[in-house]
Amino acid sequence: MKTYFYQQLNGLDRRVYDEIVNGLHQGQLKISVSSFSSVKKVAVDIFNNYPQYFWIASRVRAMRTLLKTVVQFDQSYSVSDIRKYQSQIKELVQKFIFENINDHQTDYDKVLILHDYLKNSIEYDHQAAAHVNDKTNRYVSAYNIVGALIKHKCVCDGFAKAMKYLCDQIGIECYVVNGIGSNMQDSAPHAWNIVNIDGCYQHVDVTWDNQFMDDNFPLYAYLNLDDKTIARDHSWDKRLYPACTSLEYNYFKINNALIDSKAQLKKFLIDSFSLEEDIIQYRVDKDSRLASEIFSCYQEITQEAIQACKYVRIGDIRTQYQMEQLVFTIVPKYVD
């Protein structure tokens, strides 16, 4: 599948892109290409969106002579390790797809399954993140699908490339996005995904749904967002990726948990408590009046909802919120 970025390239750049991808497919580390100036332009997209070539280091050198231009990649693993990891990844992914994916599921269902699998099976590699400028191969797996799928420990690049790889295996269009992740304290380079669900492009950031959750608070704050919503704490070059213009497949919209008023929130909580749901999660619509009031009123509304439940008793609740995305999670303790 040709990437969105590829479709924006001119003829010469496309030719160089194809020459590099074809060379990598044949296992080459030195590849002759048609243009020196095109190499840097296409290399990042190839690194991101061909995660099956996990053994190439994220460095590329282009050497120009009178007769030709040669692109040279560094190899991050031995040949025996490459074959071992290829075999392990193939076996793992085939088993996962056989057990979890079927033709009766919608694309939304499939993206949700992939999101949850990666979110729940991977530990964020804080040590690798702290040594981002390390010039050795000590942390190389944290940045590719070996770390994500085999070692179950990686940074955002590994999460995003694993999501891309799994989507490729089940026929869902997906891209790795490079940009900046921000909060009130800090900002740093970050990677996440854009997926195509029934013709609707949506942002998915598995890393942040993984990092901001604990054992009691699973998070869906970054599952299927439009450009406007994710831009609250992410920035990227929009020219390089398809526009995400709708929240049609947002997790909270699909689950009727996108809240825009106090009355709607109270009813949502009453219904959730009455069903004795173990974990309750909702998103406040940023464009609603409630968004400016929620932090001063959510506790009061929660207590009103508890008191309005006739047949359910709640002894205690735990609440956590994700401030930038206005996502709230409640874990109630029901009393028999």
Language model features with spans:
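Secondary-structure boundary elements
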Residues: 78-148
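Hydrophobic (often cysteine-bearing) scaffold residues that line and stabilize catalytic clefts
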Residues: 89, 110, 155, 159, ...
